[in-house]
Amino acid sequence: MLLVVIFGLVALFALWGVLRSVRNKNILGFLLAGATLFVFGWFTVMTVINSGYPTAH
């Protein structure tokens, strides 16, 4: 359960980074934050689908 929360928080911070880098016209920041958002967002979704929330034993 804690893993989903951590992945979700990282994905939210990455979303904030994407929006901030677009506003500042920072291409490298956009690419890195976008990649982080994609990876951790995918991990969050797959962890919820696989393990459920709260975690099913």
Curated annotation (Swiss-Prot):
Main location: membrane
Entry GO terms, CC: plasma membrane
One Pfam match: DUF2759
InterPro entries referenced in this protein's UniProt entry, alphabetically: DUF2759 (IPR024490)
Highest taxon of the lineage: Bacteria
Membrane topology: Multi-pass membrane protein
Keywords per UniProt: Cell membrane, Membrane, Transmembrane, Transmembrane helix
Localization annotation: Cell membrane
Annotated TM spans: 2-22, 29-49
Protein name: Uncharacterized protein YqgW
